[in-house]
């Protein structure tokens, strides 16, 4: 019998047949698949757009998008780009097919294209089918953010250790620390906060809130909400009760430590929305106050008293402030120094202030005089007025001249814990004639900065920087109380200095004798209407506006015609940030002594009819008056020296320019103009007084010619901004005329290829360039090496450099620069910028050296450093930034 074989041939044929059918279907069904792909992609895009609108609403409420949803959005964006390419080639590919779509003139190419269409169709269908019930979550925040701290007070280490251990005890939910003003409670609480920041101690989040004397529940709620990532319109529209419920529901799920600094009365935690820290582990509250009674009302059984320093410890602190040079300048001074230190009663604030005041007193006679002055203000009863204020008043009395003293008292007009812009203070001082401005505003400003420096060095003011180059000062609350006490003639004439700033009052306070009121501050309040007439015959300052960093917007709407009738000495009137104020009464003409008028961020459209009678006015602020249509009548203000029009909507017609050119005493002008405002750009007089100039608008052929004239027209220009202009280059020349320029901001300028003109600004401190898609160089080598420019080394004083969305930028400078003052380089979306003009010696040196920031870690990996030493110097200071 022969051997036979059976081969299963049919299944193989079947599989091959299926494979061939699938390949043929890619081409045969191409048109149907393309139509389905286009339709399904439209549906996917509609779904994405709906979800993105929902995402925008939820992110406005402080929520953050889920990573899963972001991956989906990225996938949709990726597949959309691919499909755009596929659909672009559809006609070519369809024409390539033949034999009823079963074959192709290029079979391989058609197969690949058809397969890609088929696979993308399946991918789009899958993306479209994904369901998102939730796309956001509660925004995550850093657990703790370290707070800036003054140097540790000598002798507080033991108390800090004790407070930290006490707060961490299982049975302690609330810890209160009390003591007199200036004893170091805030410093101790800050050290405690930073200690928790370092160790975390198992808590999810730490929250710091300054409460201050005028306690407002919603203010505390808003600060806690900000830390929790809440915000937007939905939050601000909630009432106090709703905010409390919202905070409670979030905090009850977290372990937290809440630090409340400077409370003056019982704080109702339930009303704020803070779960009771005593009811569950993982919740802690630490606060400071001046009153032991407040501790008891807050439910603290064993409050910690922050006591003044013991005599020997206090003397150690005092000696450090005085310095060994002064202590050793005469054999008798150390013994007298111990007597002076003893008069400070161990109060750290007084020891610091008096010690620094005495640091330059190097004769026995000066020290004996100091003891005599301190003894002349004996303390007779417990409290601020009998112990702290007389001591602080000695530092006040020791200030040189009434000018510096009056300047300090003026700072007390601002709200408690206020950050006060230095330039605002100085403007007020000049117009109140505390500083003589007769020799020019710039000289007067220099004097103002000298006074501020004197007060800072005397520890009566503290400097504060907002990180954006705008410097401010703040006043310790004890020093502020001292200033108010002195201004009211040691409490005898309390109505001379009326300060109700930032406390939420809704009407003008009731005053027994308006004739004694000299200065009044009602800034950052809720007063809607000023009605009636008040006989304020001695009133020189009236503040009804808001600070730059104020938290409460002024709400003034109307001023009655008779309100200004009896204020013949009023020199300073601040109505800034009253965004519901549309006009001023004609009777403002009665303010015959007015020198300063601030209408910043108001809604006025015209100057009041009585403006021409204000013959003494020297300072007029109309910045951000977005409805301003005319300044007719301003030519009557013959003594006007400072006019601020930045970001106002004033139309720059010929009449406006002519009227301004008649102001013969004008020294400082800030303004925003459209390049089409040829009349302004052609005015040598106005350009020569420009301190801040912003050019905004579209391209004009004459813009460069006017910019060239600008370079020879002004030596006062400090801030220069060009925004949304189409211009190939900025032609400026003349190094001698840009010595004052410190801030340059260029935004959204099409066609701009280089900024070589910046070599003529040797004092520039901040340079920001955003959205200049054609920019290739900051300083162009070829242009910079032409003529006189070849010997100039740019940016010797530059502090901050920001470069954002400059896709063609390749070079900042062609070789390393010293950059001796450079603190920060912020770079975003500059893919072709791979080499920085740095070597190992560039940038600000020391512990707080130059920082380089970018949002993309791959950019750092691609940087071409000058050498290994440069890489070693700067790579550790490179920081990733996250954009919300």
Curated annotation (Swiss-Prot):
Residues 136-440 form the NB-ARC domain. Belongs to the disease resistance NB-LRR family. Probable disease resistance protein. GO terms for cellular component: nucleus. It comes from the Eukaryota. LRR repeats lie at residues 569-591, 593-615, 616-638, 639-661. GO terms for molecular function: ADP binding; ATP binding. This is Probable disease resistance protein At1g63360.
């Amino acid at each position: 019998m022969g051997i036979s074989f059976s081969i299963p041939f049919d299944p193989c044929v079947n599989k091959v047949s299926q494979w061939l059918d699938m390949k043929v279907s890619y081409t045969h069904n191409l048109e149907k698949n393309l139509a389905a792909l286009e339709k399904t992609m439209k549906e996917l895009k509609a779904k994405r757009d709906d979800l993105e609108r929902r995402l925008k609403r939820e992110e406005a409420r402080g929520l953050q998008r889920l990573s899963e949803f972001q991956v989906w959005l990225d996938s949709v964006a990726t597949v959309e780009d691919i499909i755009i390419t596929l659909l672009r080639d559809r006609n070519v590919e369809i024409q390539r097919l033949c034999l009823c779509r079963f074959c192709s003139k290029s079979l391989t190419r058609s197969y690949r294209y058809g397969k890609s269409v088929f696979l993308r169709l399946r991918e789009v269908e899958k993306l479209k089918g994904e369901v998102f019930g939730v796309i956001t979550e509660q925004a995550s925040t850093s657990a703790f953010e370290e707070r800036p701290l003054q140097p540790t007070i000598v002798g507080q280490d033991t108390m800090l250790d004790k407070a930290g251990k006490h707060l961490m005890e299982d049975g302690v939910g609330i810890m209160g620390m009390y003591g007199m003003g200036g004893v170091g409670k805030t410093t101790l609480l800050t050290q405690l906060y930073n200690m928790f920041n370092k160790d975390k101690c198992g808590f999810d989040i730490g929250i710091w809130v300054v409460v201050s004397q005028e306690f407002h529940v919603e203010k505390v709620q808003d600060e806690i909400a900000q830390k929790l990532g809440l915000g937007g319109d939905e939050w601000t529209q909630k009432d106090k009760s709703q905010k409390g419920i919202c905070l409670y529901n979030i905090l009850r799920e977290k372990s937290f430590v809440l630090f409340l600094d400077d409370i003056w009365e019982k704080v109702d935690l339930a009303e704020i929305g803070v779960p009771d820290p005593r009811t569950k582990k993982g919740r802690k509250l630490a606060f400071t106050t001046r009153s032991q009674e407040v501790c008891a009302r807050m439910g603290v059984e064993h409050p910690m008293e922050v006591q003044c320093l013991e005599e020997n410890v206090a003397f150690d602190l005092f000696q450090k402030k005085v310095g060994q040079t002064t202590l050793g300048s005469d054999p008798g001074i150390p013994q007298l120094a111990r007597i002076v230190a003893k008069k400070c009663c161990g109060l750290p604030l007084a020891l610091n202030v008096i010690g620094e005041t005495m640091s330059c007193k190097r004769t026995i006679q000066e020290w004996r005089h100091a003891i005599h002055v301190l003894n002349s203000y004996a303390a007779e009863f417990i409290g601020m007025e009998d112990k702290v204020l007389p001591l602080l008043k000695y530092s006040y009395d020791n200030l040189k001249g009434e000018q510096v003293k009056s300047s300090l008292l003026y700072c007390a007009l601002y709200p408690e814990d206020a950050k006060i812009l230095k330039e605002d203070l100085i403007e007020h001082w000049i117009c109140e004639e505390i500083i003589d401005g007769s020799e020019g505003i710039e000289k007067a400003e220099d004097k103002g900065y000298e006074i501020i420096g004197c007060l800072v060095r005397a520890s009566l003011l503290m400097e504060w920087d907002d990180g954006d180059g705008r410097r401010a000062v703040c006043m310790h609350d004890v020093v502020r109380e001292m200033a108010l006490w002195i201004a009211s003639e040691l409490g005898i004439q309390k109505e001379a200095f009326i300060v109700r700033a930032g406390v939420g009052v809704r009407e003008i306070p009731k005053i027994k004798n308006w004739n004694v009121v000299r200065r009044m501050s009602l800034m950052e309040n809720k007063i809607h209407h000023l009605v009636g007439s008040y006989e304020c015959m001695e009133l020189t300052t009236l503040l009804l506006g808001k600070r730059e960093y104020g938290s409460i917007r002024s709400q003034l709407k109307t001023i009655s015609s008779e309100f200004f009738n009896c204020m013949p000495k009023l020199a300073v009137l601040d109505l800034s940030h009253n965004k519901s104020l549309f006009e001023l009464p004609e009777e403002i003409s009665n303010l015959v002594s007015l020198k300063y008028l601030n209408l910043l961020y108001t809604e006025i459209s015209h100057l009041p009819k009585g403006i021409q009678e204000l013959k003494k006015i020297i300072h007029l602020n109309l910045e951000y008056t977005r409805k301003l249509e005319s300044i007719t009548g301003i030519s009557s203000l013959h003594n006007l020296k400072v006019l601020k029009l930045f970001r106002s909507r004033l139309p720059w017609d010929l009449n406006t320019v002519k009227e301004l050119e008649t102001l013969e005493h004008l020294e400082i002008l800030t303004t925003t103009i459209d390049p089409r405002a040829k009349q302004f750009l052609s005015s040598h007089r106005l350009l020569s007084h420009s301190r801040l100039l912003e050019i905004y608008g579209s391209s004009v052929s004459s813009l460069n010619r006017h910019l060239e004239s600008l370079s020879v027209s002004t030596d006062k220009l400090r801030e220069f901004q060009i925004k949304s202009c189409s211009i190939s280059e900025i032609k400026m020349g003349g190094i001698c005329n840009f010595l004052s320029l410190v801030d340059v901001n260029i935004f959204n300028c099409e066609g701009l290829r280089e900024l070589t003109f910046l070599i003529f600004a040797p004092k520039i401190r901040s340079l920001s360039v955003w959205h200049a898609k054609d920019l290739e160089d900051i300083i162009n080598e070829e242009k910079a090496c032409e003529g006189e420019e070849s010997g100039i080394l740019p940016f010797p004083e530059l502090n901050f450099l920001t470069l954002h969305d400059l896709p063609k930028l390749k070079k900042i400078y062609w070789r390393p620069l010293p950059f001796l003052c450079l603190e920060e380089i912020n770079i975003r979306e500059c893919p072709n910028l791979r080499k920085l003009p740095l070597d190992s010696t560039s940038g600000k040196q020391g512990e707080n050296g130059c920082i380089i920031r970018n949002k993309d870690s791959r950019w750092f990996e691609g940087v071409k450093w000058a050498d290994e030493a440069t890489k070693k110097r700067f790579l550790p200071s490179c920081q990733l930034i996250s954009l919300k």
